[in-house]
A protein has these predicted regions:
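SAM-dependent transferase fold signal centered on methyltransferase-like domains
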Residues: 1-340
Length: 340
């Protein structure tokens, strides 16, 4: 159980907006204050102010070490998953998060279910969830400090299973193949499909979504989620049933571009080196770049690529709804210094 004494809580409240490095150098004059834990909380709250505003608004929340804060979902991406699950899961009685972590996604998704199971191997993170759950109004959760494979074997039928496999190996190095993530969802695939109608996998945006769809052979929707034009998450909706719309959805803030999953990337791609003066140059956002279906982009928005391998597009027409950045073409020049 996570406990902070009154002196430590007072120190956190009094110095919440101060520079953590300066506080560490200053130290404290009393042994009543757990300074390392206090600094962790101050740093966590400062990150949560922008990343997790609803958590930051609750004084009793206890935060994990900085690395966990950096790696956790933002409130924006967690809410996106919540909306996705509400569309796909018409019945929302039971859910299980088999890789609980800090619990941002779990606590967001659990709000819409009658019962939710949080599974996490790290005892410290389990203790944090035991403390933060009631603060967040979650009184219907079961916390299990166990390995997910063992829990999955004994788990009753669920309406939703959520998993966020770790994208680092035992040495802390990044991995970029689905089979290298832990837990290995490929080896658990059959059990997962038997245990839940909907399985939502959160993966690194660095993974090749085409390869993941091929390997799993049960993906019904793909969601590439970016915020601020930076890809944050790759979400795969899996099921043994024909649920969902079969699309790849590229999302960046309010921009959304979807296309059928089976679309060949460059089918319909139109190219031209002709540039219209006073026309417009278009650059797709990061999510669309990751999606890679530029032929569909040409068809939907009537743009042409500057080259077969170019990711810049032109059109004589201004399109406010293009999923990316727009520029008016004022002049055209070669790389000749005198022309420039």
């Amino acid at each position: 159980m996570i406990t902070l004494n009154d002196a430590t809580w007072r120190f956190i409240r009094d110095h919440r907006t101060d520079d953590v490095r300066q506080l560490a150098l200053m130290g404290v004059k009393t042994s009543e204050i757990d300074l390392p834990l206090a600094l962790q909380q101050i740093q966590g709250w400062q990150t949560a102010r922008t990343k997790l505003p609803s958590w930051a608004a609750k004084e009793e929340i206890v935060y994990p070490p900085h690395l966990n804060m950096e790696q956790c979902s933002s409130e924006t991406t967690a809410e996106y998953k919540r909306d996705l699950v509400k569309r796909l899961c018409m019945v929302r009685k039971t859910m299980a998060d088999l890789t609980g972590g800090m619990g941002i996604d779990f606590s967001t998704l659990a709000q819409d279910f009658d019962k939710a199971v949080y599974v996490e191997r790290n005892p410290t993170l389990c203790a944090l969830m035991a403390h933060n759950g009631p603060v967040l109004g979650l009184d219907h959760v079961e916390i299990r400090n166990e390995d997910c494979a063992g829990v999955l074997a004994m788990l009753p039928q669920q309406d939703l299973i959520f998993m966020d496999p770790a994208r680092r190996d035992h040495h802390g190095g990044r991995v970029f193949q689905l089979q290298d993530c832990q837990p290995d969802v490929l080896s658990l695939r059959e059990k997962l499909l038997r245990k839940a109608r909907v399985i939502l996998l959160k993966l690194s945006p660095m993974l090749d979504w085409h390869a993941a769809v091929h390997q799993l052979d049960c993906v019904r929707e793909v969601h590439i989620v970016a915020t601020g034009n930076e890809c944050k998450e790759l979400l795969l909706v899996c099921s043994s049933e024909q649920i969902g719309d079969g699309n790849v959805c590229c999302v960046n803030n309010g921009q959304r571009f979807c296309f059928p999953m089976e679309t060949t990337p460059n089918t319909g791609l139109k190219t031209s080196q002709e540039i219209h003066m006073e026309g417009f140059l278009y650059e797709p956002n990061a999510a669309v770049m990751k999606g890679g279906c530029f032929g569909m982009l040409c068809e939907k928005y009537k743009v042409v690529a500057l080259g077969h391998d170019s990711h810049l597009f032109t059109s004589p027409i201004m399109m406010d709804d293009f999923p990316g950045r727009r520029f008016r073409i004022k002049a055209v020049s070669s790389f000749n210094k005198k022309e420039l």
